Amino acid sequence: VKRLSGLRLQVENPEQLARFYADVLGMDAWAEDEAWRAGYAGEDADLILLPGGRRVQHSRDERYWKIGICLPDLDAACEQLRRKGVDVSAPHQFRDIGYMAHLHDPEGFAIELLQHDFLGRRPDDAGDPMLPLGGGAHLGQITLRTGDIAAELAARADMALLSVQDVAEFGFDLHFLAYTREAPPVPDLRAVGNREWLWRRPYTTLEFQHLAGAKLRDSPAFLGLELT
């Protein structure tokens, strides 16, 4: 089975940004030729930070959106980040999708923090507040936007579609794909019952925010995905 092993971003200062992901978000960081890699141990994807980029305002009409970091205890993670002076939004349960919070890295790239369990369902023994981000964090999603989900799915026929999540009042739906032989516990891919299962997967999923018919522009910083 192939693996989604990296997200390639062209940034202003690869080493400095990698240090943020290491010091603040608990990833390992190391130099690799002219780039820096930052990632968690395990089968999830790394960030591959390449030189030559410049800091620009990111907007909602761009192809690239965010990364999502899944973890067992969102409240502990946010408390830790605030103690380090990081501006992170208040955790909230977004519809029947997940308990989440948002922040930006020093170059303005969006990061979502997503708890394994919905609000009020976290086990008492989840995570460890002494570990970075409360322990157990992994890169759960790389999120792109699309105006044509049928074309995206056709281009990625070797990936399994694991979940489809409607967010009709905001005018989009979400599709999650992965290189895996696993099947969700509930055969209906729209079932809410699959979502907490999805946030626990050890591999990184490719998430599409589908805005039907949207005309999106390329993101200068997004240099594609690494597959191994």
Segments predicted by a language model, with ranges:
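Core segments of cupin and vicinal oxygen chelate
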Residues: 1-48, 52, 144-203
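Short amphipathic alpha-helical segments
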Residues: 3-7, 45, 61-67, 138-142, ...
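Vicinal oxygen chelate
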Residues: 6, 78-144, 155-157, 162-194, ...
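Short glycine-biased active-site loop of nucleotidyltransferases that positions the nucleotide triphosphate
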Residues: 39-42, 59, 102
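Short amphipathic beta-strand starts and helix->beta connectors
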Residues: 49-54, 126-127, 204-212
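Histidine-centered metal-chelating micro-motifs
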Residues: 54-55, 100
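Residue-level marker of regulatory loop/turn positions in helix-turn-helix DNA-binding domains and
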Residues: 59-60, 131
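Short proline/glycine-enriched turn/loop motifs at strand-loop junctions of beta-rich domains
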Residues: 71-75
